Amino acid sequence: RKYTSEECLDESGKSCDAIGRIGTLPSPMSMGDYTEQVKEALNCFSLRSIGEADEQVQTVALCSGAGGDFIYTAYRAGADVYVTSDVRHHEAQLAQELGMNLIDAGHFETENIICEFLSGYLLDKFEDVNVRTSAAVPYFA
């Protein structure tokens, strides 16, 4: 689901416009197991995480791309873990201070997962448009 307007507040209490989502896993799992599941699902070579491997998580918030600005929003929404990318040092500190489990899975990895779907959607809607997708990880190989 989308965040509610009551949840879309930054750490100073100001309203923000979060584009992330929040949902619930079918059953709780350990942070360590969930981290491995994210790594496999997004085909991550590596990722960074904050949290105890044996802590149970079930409510997951996510924002593809650089979503570090929404750590507090995920926390207010009741997420056990927040999946995003490009988390900066002070954002990671905030997550740790809040006790928020955090997975930084990489910018490309968190956005690339939708490319095949969007490509098909655009081809269906716009027959005269050429659509290309790239599987190359930009910048850092």
Give the label of every model feature segment.
Residues 1-141:
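Hydrophobic structural segments
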